[in-house]
Structure formats: structure tokens, C-alpha cells
Amino acid sequence: MEQRRLASTEWVDIVNEENEVIAQASREQMRAQCLRHRATYIVVHDGMGKILVQRRTETKDFLPGMLDATAGGVVQADEQLLESARREAEEELGIAGVPFAEHGQFYFEDKNCRVWGALFSCVSHGPFALQEDEVSGVCWLTPEEITARCDEFTPDSLKALALWMKRNAKNEAVETETAE
């Protein structure tokens, strides 16, 4: 019985302030002790200004029932960031075979969470196959609609979305300058 429990345990890398791996722990231990770890954040958008928003199930171990402005999740031990992002997008939403853009990393910390986030984005129009034990529903919202309802969203996903929007605005400005 103990061997089966250990085999089903999800292991994650624990990292320091510089995002260097210093240990491994079970996901359960990481949550209980608020250990610093890595996660992926994927902004799924339609390419026309709308963001796919998820409603977290009430059984999630972190911020159940809240809205998420990004897909993604905890990076498993020894897993590459892009590999994790692709795995999470496919598991949560059924998104596979689409290009992912990388937007760098960021740090987020509050009383519930200490995480180094890897930010990605992709364009998808569905249909979406929701992972029933993690995602209870999805809808499309504009960034302005998300901002107006910010108290309903996970704070780490809002930080990821704000960073994506800021980096996207810079890319659009560079493209505009180049075109002139």
C-alpha cells in the first residue's frame, strides 16, 4: 500500500530565491509548507483580444472555485518548462499541436504561494476538452472585463496576465516602429 502511495505522489522541484533547484518535495508537502517552486502560466487567447478564463473546481488544492486568467500548473520534478506548459494545456483544456510563445519568467509571492512562473501564450479557438477534476468551466473575457472582476481571480494568474500584456504591448510597439 505504501509503495502504491509513493508511486502516485507528485514530486516537484523546490527552488531558492534565484530559481535554482535545491530539493524535491511532494506536492502535498510543498503546499503545506508554502515551499518555493516552479509553475507554468499559459495565456490562451483568440488572437482578437479575448482571453480564455477558467473556473477552478472546488476540489483544487490551491484557491478552489476561483477564476484563472491562465492555464498551467506546477512543474513536476526534473520537467522542462515548455514540456510542463504543453502537458498542462493538454490536460486542462485539450490543447495540443499549437505553437507556444515564451515570454520569460517572473516571481510571485503572497501568504499562500511562493512561485517562479514561466510565462507562455498560445492562440486557440477550441473546442476545449476540460479536465473535470480541475476545470469546471471556461469563458472568453477581454482584459478589461478581467480587471473589472479581479477579486474573483487567482492573484498569480493576474500577475502573469499583466506581464503578458506588458510584453505584448512592447512587441506591438516594436513592430509598429519597424513598419514605419
From Swiss-Prot:
Give the Nudix hydrolase domain ranges: 35-163
Protein keywords = Hydrolase, Magnesium, Metal-binding
Any idea which positions bind Mg(2+)? E88, E92
Q: Record's CDD domains?
A: NUDIX_Hydrolase
What InterPro entries does UniProt report for this protein, alphabetically? NUDIX_hydrolase-like_dom_sf, NUDIX_hydrolase_dom, NUDIX_hydrolase_YfcD_pred
Q: Which GO terms describe its molecular function?
A: hydrolase activity, acting on acid anhydrides; metal ion binding
Give the family, as the similarity comment puts it: Belongs to the Nudix hydrolase family.
Q: Kindly provide the name given to this protein in its UniProt entry.
A: Uncharacterized Nudix hydrolase YfcD
